UniProtKB/Swiss-Prot annotation:
This is Transcription factor HES-4. A motif (WRPW motif) lies at residues 216-219. One of its GO terms (biological process) is nervous system development. Has a particular type of basic domain (presence of a helix-interrupting proline) that binds to the N-box (CACNAG), rather than the canonical E-box (CANNTG). The C-terminal WRPW motif is a transcriptional repression domain necessary for the interaction with Groucho/TLE family members, transcriptional corepressors recruited to specific target DNA by Hairy-related proteins. Residues 1-22 have a biased composition (Low complexity). The lineage of its organism: Eukaryota, Metazoa, Chordata, Craniata, Vertebrata. It comes from Homo sapiens.
Length: 221
């Protein structure tokens, strides 16, 4: 009878295979998916940094302006930034005034540099064919007016009398004054709409000898 009794079926080596094969490993996330998942965390950190910096800026600006923090406890972010901008502009004006008081030649150097930039703009516009004459005249007139607002360049008293002036005396060409260029290849022709630059000056010849090379160019003398 024992021989007729069927025994337990032996465990097949492939019995557990389907269960393990059905479990696929997780696919690695792409860089875009990683950025998308981490974006909220990064945004939270960014906002925390901004708020922390604004809090420190508020403390600094109130201390600099000598204002009580208790009276300005509910300042908005825009108010903090505007107060900071106004304070920095005020500091810049103070620094410029202090620099001029310490060295009067600073304004002359700044004016000379502005004059050189004006001359460079004039040279650039002279080589641009598409710039209308009225646009060029208005631009040069505006820059010359800005140069006039800087005030006349004064030689510091510490310089010896033999030291050369910062700019040569103006000349006249074709009835219109020339703005001297400090080291530039040619001076600037002052626009006629600037009455402050058209003061009486010694007359200069309107025409000169023309050689085979072309018309007379007074700025190449």
């Amino acid at each position: 009878m024992a021989a007729d009794t069927p025994g337990k079926p032996s465990a097949s080596p492939m019995a557990g295979a389907p269960a393990s094969a059905s479990r696929t490993p997780d696919k690695p996330r792409s860089a875009a998916e990683h950025r998308k998942s981490s974006k909220p965390v990064m945004e939270k950190r960014r906002r925390a940094r901004i708020n922390e910096s604004l809090a420190q800026l508020k403390t600094l600006i109130l201390d600099a302006l000598r204002k009580e923090s208790s009276r300005h406890s509910k300042l908005e972010k825009a108010d903090i930034l505007e107060m900071t901008v106004r304070h920095l502009r005020s500091l810049r004006r103070v620094q410029v005034t202090a620099a001029l008081s310490a060295d009067p030649a600073v304004l002359g150097k700044y004016r000379a540099g502005f004059h050189e930039c004006l001359a460079e703009v004039n040279r650039f516009l002279a080589g641009c064919e598409g710039v209308p004459a009225d646009v060029r005249s208005r631009l040069l007139g505006h820059l010359a007016a800005c140069l006039r607002q800087l005030g006349p360049s004064r030689r510091p008293a510490s310089l010896s009398p033999a030291a050369p002036a910062e700019a040569p005396a103006p000349e006249v060409y074709a009835g219109r004054p020339l703005l001297p260029s400090l080291g530039g290849p040619f001076p600037l022709l002052a626009p006629p709409l600037l009455p402050g630059l058209t003061r009486a000056l010694p007359a200069a010849p309107r025409a000169g000898p023309q050689g085979p090379g072309g018309p007379w160019r007074p700025w190449l003398r």
